[in-house]
Amino acid sequence: MQRGLGTFAAALCLATASPAFAHHSHPLVYDWCKSVTVEGRVESVEYKNPHSIIVVRQDDGTAYTVDWLALDALTRDRILESAKGALAFGARVSVTGAPIRTLAEIQKSFPDFKGEVNPRTIDPWQIRRVGDTFSWALPQSPNPANCAGVFRTPAR
């Protein structure tokens, strides 16, 4: 009985972990061999669970949105508490991160991938804001420095 219950519990954990792994599969979605850096002034910050959002506007007027991923409540609280002063409106920040892969790049690197990619993450689009921690650039641009995009940053 104990063994059967343990096997059932393990199977249940694995079954429910798959969707979470797919959602947070960073090597699949981000190209960690490249990096993109954006510098500018903080336009707004939204502290919320599970992703806080920071908007940064470059001196040329281009805006980026950074989706700040926090790993757990303790980490999130610590990061948000320490970041509140540094990320005040008008503060100058530098954001560096890995650019998002295109659907074609994902399928080339992971031939068995049969899923879908949210079109918002692979199509070029002008973004209103930028944040600070790990980043994406728009995939169609040959020069990531000229991209307007969404950035994601791993919590530290």
Give the role of each language-model region.
Residues G61-L71:
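A short macromolecule-binding patch
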Residues F21-V36:
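Short boundary/loop segments of OB/S1/cold-shock single-stranded nucleic-acid-binding domains
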